[in-house]
Amino acid sequence: INFNDFERARTSDDTEISGFRNCYQKVLSKEFDKKIYECVGKVLQKYADTFVHFSTGLTTEDTGYMHLIYKGSEKGEYKTHTDHFDLYPRVLSCSFILNDKYDGGDFSFFDGEHVVKKKTGSVVVFPSNFCFPHAVTPVTNGDRHAIITWIR
């Protein structure tokens, strides 16, 4: 993915992004945004407790939240990519799985070598760097909902 593709993906609203991402993005209410913020704090604490050498530097902040909807009727997907770019440095990526009543739409790493099991309410946390290429495979039935954020 090149910078122009990344920039379009980062700023999109309800559009397909240059063949890399085919999903819809919804804005979260301020009330829900606060709830997610609290969840992210708990997730980060658990991550830091598990990986004692984890550090983002002097300050830690998230980049806001996006509700992504991958529609089965449109084969919604996000092709293999990484989340860190020099202009938008990110340390950790977080994907909250909001539902599991859909087919396809697997969150996978390393060209499908590792597939994350779908479970409503779970969160996937991983380093944003080049060592963790990941994708969402096409949804074939139902709609996949997730909230994503990045920590920098």
Q: In which residue ranges do the predicted regions lie?
A:
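Non-heme Fe(II)/2-oxoglutarate
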Residues: 1-59
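Histidine-centered catalytic micro-motifs
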Residues: 77-85
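Acidic, glycine-rich loop-and-strand cores that form catalytic or ligand-binding grooves
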Residues: 55-71
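Residue-level preference for beta-strand/loop junctions
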Residues: 59, 76, 88-90, 143
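Short, conserved beta-strand element in jelly-roll/cupin
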Residues: 67-72, 85-103, 150-151
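Acidic/histidine-enriched, beta-strand-rich ligand/metal-binding domains
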Residues: 33-39, 50-53, 64, 122, ...
